[in-house]
């Protein structure tokens, strides 16, 4: 038995495997799930539409996505459409423990007799625990998983890298400059290779497709595709308009402020704020902070995004130009080493540093931890780091997603858009698998419009309907799609 397995064991009750913080939190979680269902019209509409068809019957979906109340509604939607599901979070801090408990117990179970879905997630996992949970999510009794629903690409990477190393006959040793997380990842694969030399290959051969939620995970998928290492089709959910233009912007506009307020409770008005990156997420960050009266500056590598920022009223600067005067610094790029140790040392005393990109390497936390700076934990996911010269900075969520670590993430309504796309993408790959090659696809425009239409109606909007003559004049169908694929919205 390995070190990890000695400390971490799967619990099982009434035939349901799980590892969560506390099943007694299930009633609280169920109350919040019921409220969330009211705010997630897209998912509820899909339940009604497909209730009698069960299009996901036979699907064994391994899901790696933030285990929140909103995700609970997604999971139970997948189950209502016929799927079997196993779940883990895609972030060590993002799990809402009451939501995880409620999903395990299910709407008709009790903590003593759960009747829900296997979940392996709790808030505040170590890296070792995180990857252990990911393996449990992908490890099914009997037949292996045949679908993956991913956020950030960790589940997909675990399967594909595991299969790749099995084919090579060896798991490579960690390099000195590898991140602490990658070393844990390799160690898990090495331990598993000692006991089962074909585990990941079997899963990779069984999986019919993956649907990916976020920018970072999509990048990984395109890298696998370019290298000829993608053994199944993938749908890029992130670039559906009703995801990227809503979740990424409007969701961030709501949840960034929530995370900063809960983490620090500082007045934002009047503060100098530096936003690194002006993509859809960065736009939401800048808009929310400017709305609070902050003086916002933006960094960008892309002249088009930089011009957008300037036209929106934000100065475009480099990190080096602004880091010494910023009161709050937020990274939102999807890239690495955006804020280095030298940048952190140059920050003002008690300046706040946070990240809202998917991974923790936008801020070089590894270098900060090695620097000799003293860390004092103020409260969960809020740390003060003091340098040798006596000045300090406040780091939120250890450089990971602050909106989920310090708060509860995006609100239900905007996640209904994103998760409706996920459900539709899962149905698409499961029911029409032979129509897809081993490549990365986006959802068809008419499906994007379907998701938007549901939510327009839920907000009380009334769409104008084209006449037949008007539709012919602009060369579209009366029922859509209304825009070409290259339209940017």
Curated annotation (Swiss-Prot):
<feature type="binding site">
    <location>
        <position position="213"/>
    </location>
    <ligand>
        <name>substrate</name>
    </ligand>
</feature>
<dbReference type="InterPro" id="IPR020082">
    <property type="entry name" value="S-Ado-L-homoCys_hydrolase_CS"/>
</dbReference>
<keyword id="KW-0963">Cytoplasm</keyword>
<feature type="binding site">
    <location>
        <position position="151"/>
    </location>
    <ligand>
        <name>substrate</name>
    </ligand>
</feature>
<feature type="binding site">
    <location>
        <begin position="356"/>
        <end position="358"/>
    </location>
    <ligand>
        <name>NAD(+)</name>
    </ligand>
</feature>
<keyword id="KW-0554">One-carbon metabolism</keyword>
<comment type="pathway">
    <text>Amino-acid biosynthesis; L-homocysteine biosynthesis; L-homocysteine from S-adenosyl-L-homocysteine: step 1/1.</text>
</comment>
<feature type="binding site">
    <location>
        <position position="403"/>
    </location>
    <ligand>
        <name>NAD(+)</name>
    </ligand>
</feature>
<dbReference type="Pfam" id="PF05221">
    <property type="entry name" value="AdoHcyase"/>
</dbReference>
<dbReference type="GO" id="GO:0033353">
    <property type="term" value="P:S-adenosylmethionine cycle"/>
</dbReference>
<feature type="binding site">
    <location>
        <begin position="277"/>
        <end position="282"/>
    </location>
    <ligand>
        <name>NAD(+)</name>
    </ligand>
</feature>
<dbReference type="Pfam" id="PF00670">
    <property type="entry name" value="AdoHcyase_NAD"/>
</dbReference>
<feature type="binding site">
    <location>
        <position position="68"/>
    </location>
    <ligand>
        <name>substrate</name>
    </ligand>
</feature>
<feature type="binding site">
    <location>
        <position position="243"/>
    </location>
    <ligand>
        <name>substrate</name>
    </ligand>
</feature>
<dbReference type="InterPro" id="IPR036291">
    <property type="entry name" value="NAD(P)-bd_dom_sf"/>
</dbReference>
<feature type="binding site">
    <location>
        <position position="300"/>
    </location>
    <ligand>
        <name>NAD(+)</name>
    </ligand>
</feature>
<feature type="binding site">
    <location>
        <position position="335"/>
    </location>
    <ligand>
        <name>NAD(+)</name>
    </ligand>
</feature>
<feature type="binding site">
    <location>
        <begin position="214"/>
        <end position="216"/>
    </location>
    <ligand>
        <name>NAD(+)</name>
    </ligand>
</feature>
<dbReference type="InterPro" id="IPR015878">
    <property type="entry name" value="Ado_hCys_hydrolase_NAD-bd"/>
</dbReference>
<keyword id="KW-0378">Hydrolase</keyword>
<dbReference type="InterPro" id="IPR042172">
    <property type="entry name" value="Adenosylhomocyst_ase-like_sf"/>
</dbReference>
<dbReference type="GO" id="GO:0006730">
    <property type="term" value="P:one-carbon metabolic process"/>
</dbReference>
<protein>
    <recommendedName>
        <fullName>Adenosylhomocysteinase</fullName>
        <ecNumber>3.13.2.1</ecNumber>
    </recommendedName>
</protein>
<comment type="function">
    <text>May play a key role in the regulation of the intracellular concentration of adenosylhomocysteine.</text>
</comment>
<dbReference type="GO" id="GO:0004013">
    <property type="term" value="F:adenosylhomocysteinase activity"/>
</dbReference>
<feature type="binding site">
    <location>
        <position position="247"/>
    </location>
    <ligand>
        <name>substrate</name>
    </ligand>
</feature>
<dbReference type="GO" id="GO:0071269">
    <property type="term" value="P:L-homocysteine biosynthetic process"/>
</dbReference>
<dbReference type="GO" id="GO:0005829">
    <property type="term" value="C:cytosol"/>
</dbReference>
<comment type="similarity">
    <text>Belongs to the adenosylhomocysteinase family.</text>
</comment>
<dbReference type="InterPro" id="IPR000043">
    <property type="entry name" value="Adenosylhomocysteinase-like"/>
</dbReference>
<feature type="binding site">
    <location>
        <position position="248"/>
    </location>
    <ligand>
        <name>NAD(+)</name>
    </ligand>
</feature>
<keyword id="KW-0520">NAD</keyword>
